[in-house]
Amino acid sequence: WLKGVVMRAHYNGLIPRNPFAQFHISPNVKEREYLTEDEIKRIMAHEFDNPTLALVRDLFIFACFTALSFVDMKELTTDEIVEVNGEKWILSKRHKTNVPFQVKLLDIPLQIIERYKYLSEDRLVFGKINYWTMCKQLKKVMAECGIEKQISYHCARHHHLSYTLKISSL
């Protein structure tokens, strides 16, 4: 912030030189953590006493199998789940880019949709869910499952990619 103010002051002629000109701060790039297949299985098998944690776990697993972003999952409607040749698919557009996408629904995501259909409001598949609540509860899910990694909801999308690559290489 201060560097920006000084740069603007120098550009506008308010100071003769920019004392920060030689300093460059490189971004702190952190390697993203991911879950192993065994950790995903452990999360799926864990029995939660708290129904909120069970919901958060199931939505995270849904994302692992569909690669939907949080906002795309949050806005997923029953109209976007269609049957094609006897199989269920999600046909929608990305919220962020408006680019169409399609995802075949495997058994586990279908079971999750069925489990939470009572939450459906205004055709939303999972009702109203809050991102920050989800993130906070996801930390509790990981802790209760004995996973000591800093996992975000976005991590589920990366699991889907590695899972897809693994399946396609078999």
Segments (PLM) and residue ranges:
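C-terminal catalytic core of tyrosine-transesterase DNA break-rejoin enzymes
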Residues: 61, 65-72, 137-140, 157-170
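Basic, Lys/Arg- and aromatic-enriched nucleic-acid-binding interface segment
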Residues: 11-70
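Active-site/catalytic core of tyrosine-dependent DNA strand-transfer enzymes
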Residues: 106-148
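Alpha-helix C-caps/helix-loop-beta hinges
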Residues: 5-8, 12, 79
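Non-catalytic DNA-binding core/recognition domains of DNA-processing enzymes
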Residues: 1-8, 23, 105
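Alpha-helix N-cap/helix-start motif at helix boundaries, enriched for small hydrophobics
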Residues: 2, 59, 71-76
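Short basic/aromatic active-site micro-motif
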Residues: 55-56, 128-132, 148-168
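Conserved tyrosine-mediated DNA breakage-rejoining catalytic core shared by Y-recombinases
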Residues: 22-39, 66, 75-114
